[in-house]
């Protein structure tokens, strides 16, 4: 690949990828974390033109794994893990701190070279999405996993759309299982099939150490992943250009400098959130909001900082989501600065001080749903939708504070997310009970609470403690049925007399067309809650009727 760093040979790169795979196995990292880390490393190597030495290559590989783990894992790799993996173990704490500081500088240089854009839609992520949608049997799973990782043995995967490669891998698995005689006909059909076969064949015969490492992470034998003996033409040409997955909008975001942030007057504090404080400042003669996120650990950039900047960049441009103006991480103070739209107030404060007209209520509700629908369409769940994190300026509503937001995988319930998310009055029942893995439907529950609050001016589930909120939910919605929730856990958590049917929320009686939809959004069973697109459609229709 012409664009790739000429000093990093195929064998050098493959050695790094093989090591990253073994580290991922030892630390039990997700497959998506590993694949994303390889994407980050390859993207970085596309950006640099110097020759890294062996030590720098090792540092880059493990730090790319660390960055990826901060995005994808509950328990990411820490700097102590990096020191261990690089075999740096001095008993001198002072020396360790110096080396850690140097590694933090390298990590920061990787992030800055990539403009902090480190979210990737990997081949494996798409395979998992397609798997769930097509309800495929498990016997194809391990071969698909193997092929997804085998394609990382060279950097040629960068030339192709990962979504298309994922689809082709699944088709190959199906054909080999159900009608292997059709395999040759299949791979002659399209370039992506030919590419997969060629890399598979090369890995099987030439990259044996890596091939065996991939197989060792599955339940398959080497024979079961043997490449079919099909000869393809040697004249097959891959695309010359790098395929660009459109995750981020076509917009350049300002990276502030140390000089810039040192000049800012941080006297006018607007408020504090989960992960930082927000100030009203003047930048380039314009008034904006500046969020300061401070990490308690010296030098180290925090996972929430990386997530928030990436989430904001991906969602930038939507009229009902707070816009990012720029960002900067100052390593000496361990502080991330994020420039944002300046809004007037939060929805929480606005509702206490204003009587909102019915027309404005409708506007706010629709804008909220438009924003959540867009956010979910980009594969991001907010995980902290509350009246304090919804911002108002005149008749415009915007969702803010993306410090807790993260990518989700389709509609499947995922066990590998942090449980302690969402403000307590907007927290979905599965989170309150601690009995479900969860997905983006926790946002739908929070949205149902917010719509109720906008329409009635009152919180539907008010309480200071979890037990109070659970009891309030029970009073209004009644007891969950056995299909929706584990009753023994519900009983132990609620500790209240049971009634089969709740009393409903009487202020919603003024909105007979909307409250059935809101109660669907508040279904105990997340699978029964409508998605954001359906909520938006139903609410629009209810206001028009």
Swiss-Prot record:
Alphabetic keyword roster: ATP-binding, Kinase, Nucleotide-binding, Serine/threonine-protein kinase, Transferase
Keyword Nucleotide-binding: yes
Organism: Acanthamoeba polyphaga mimivirus (APMV)
Positions that bind ATP: 270-278, 291
Positions of the Protein kinase domain: 264-543
Family to which the UniProt record says this protein belongs: Belongs to the protein kinase superfamily. Ser/Thr protein kinase family.
Gene3D superfamilies associated with the record: Cyclin-like, Phosphorylase Kinase, domain 1, Transferase(Phosphotransferase) domain 1
Catalytic residues (UniProt): 384
EC number: 2.7.11.1
Name this polypeptide is given: Putative serine/threonine-protein kinase L673
The reaction(s) this protein catalyses: L-seryl-[protein] + ATP = O-phospho-L-seryl-[protein] + ADP + H(+); L-threonyl-[protein] + ATP = O-phospho-L-threonyl-[protein] + ADP + H(+)
Pfam families assigned: Cyclin_N (PF00134), Pkinase (PF00069)
Coiled-coil boundaries: none
Signal peptide location: none
Top-level lineage group: Viruses
């Amino acid at each position: 690949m012409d664009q790739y760093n000429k000093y990093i040979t195929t064998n050098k790169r493959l050695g790094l990828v093989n090591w990253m795979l073994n580290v991922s196995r030892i630390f039990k990292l997700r497959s998506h974390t590993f694949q994303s880390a390889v994407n980050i490393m390859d993207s970085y190597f596309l950006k640099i033109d110097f020759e890294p030495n062996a030590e720098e290559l090792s540092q880059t590989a493990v730090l790319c794994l660390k960055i990826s783990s901060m995005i994808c894992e509950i328990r990411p790799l820490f700097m102590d893990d990096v020191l261990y993996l690089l075999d740096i173990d001095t008993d001198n704490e002072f020396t360790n701190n110096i080396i850690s500081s140097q590694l933090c500088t390298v990590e920061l240089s990787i992030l800055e070279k990539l403009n902090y854009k480190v979210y990737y839609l990997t081949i494996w992520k798409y395979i998992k999405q397609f798997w769930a949608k097509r309800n495929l049997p498990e016997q194809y799973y391990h071969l698909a996993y193997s092929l997804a990782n085998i394609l990382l043995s060279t950097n040629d995967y960068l030339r192709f759309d990962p979504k298309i490669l994922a689809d082709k891998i699944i088709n190959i698995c199906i054909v080999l299982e159900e009608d292997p005689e059709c395999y040759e006909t299949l791979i002659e059909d399209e370039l992506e099939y030919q590419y997969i076969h060629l890399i598979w064949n090369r890995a099987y015969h030439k990259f044996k150490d890596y091939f065996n490492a991939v197989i060792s992470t599955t339940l398959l034998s080497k024979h079961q992943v043997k490449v079919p003996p099909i000869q393809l033409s040697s004249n097959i040409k891959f695309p010359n250009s790098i395929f660009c997955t459109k995750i981020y909008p076509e917009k350049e975001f300002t990276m502030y400098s140390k000089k810039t942030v040192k000049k800012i007057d941080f006297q006018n504090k607007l408020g504090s959130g989960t992960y930082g404080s927000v100030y009203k400042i003047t930048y380039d003669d314009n008034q904006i909001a500046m969020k300061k996120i401070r990490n308690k650990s010296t030098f180290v950039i925090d996972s929430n900082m990386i997530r928030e900047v990436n989430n904001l960049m991906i969602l930038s441009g939507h009229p009902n989501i707070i816009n990012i103006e720029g960002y900067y991480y100052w390593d000496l103070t361990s502080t991330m600065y994020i420039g944002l739209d300046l809004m007037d107030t939060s929805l929480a404060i606005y509702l206490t001080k204003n009587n909102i007209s019915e027309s404005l209520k409708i506007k706010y509700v629709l804008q909220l749903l438009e924003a959540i629908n867009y956010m979910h369409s980009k594969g991001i769940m907010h995980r902290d939708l509350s009246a304090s994190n919804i911002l108002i300026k005149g008749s415009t509503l915007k969702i803010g504070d993306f410090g807790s937001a993260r990518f989700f995988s389709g509609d499947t319930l995922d066990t590998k997310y942090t449980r302690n998310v969402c403000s307590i009055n907007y927290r979905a029942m599965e989170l309150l009970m601690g009995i479900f893995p969860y997905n983006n439907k926790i946002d739908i529950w929070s949205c149902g609470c917010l719509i109720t609050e906008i329409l009635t001016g009152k919180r539907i589930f008010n309480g200071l403690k979890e037990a109070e909120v659970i009891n309030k939910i029970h009073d209004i919605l009644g007891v969950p049925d056995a299909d929706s929730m584990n009753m023994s856990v519900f009983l132990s958590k609620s500790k209240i007399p049971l009634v089969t049917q709740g009393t409903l929320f009487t202020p919603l009686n003024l909105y007979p067309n909307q409250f059935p939809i809101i109660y669907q959004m508040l279904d105990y069973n997340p699978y029964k809650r409508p998605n954001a697109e359906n909520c938006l459609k139903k609410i629009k229709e209810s206001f028009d009727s």
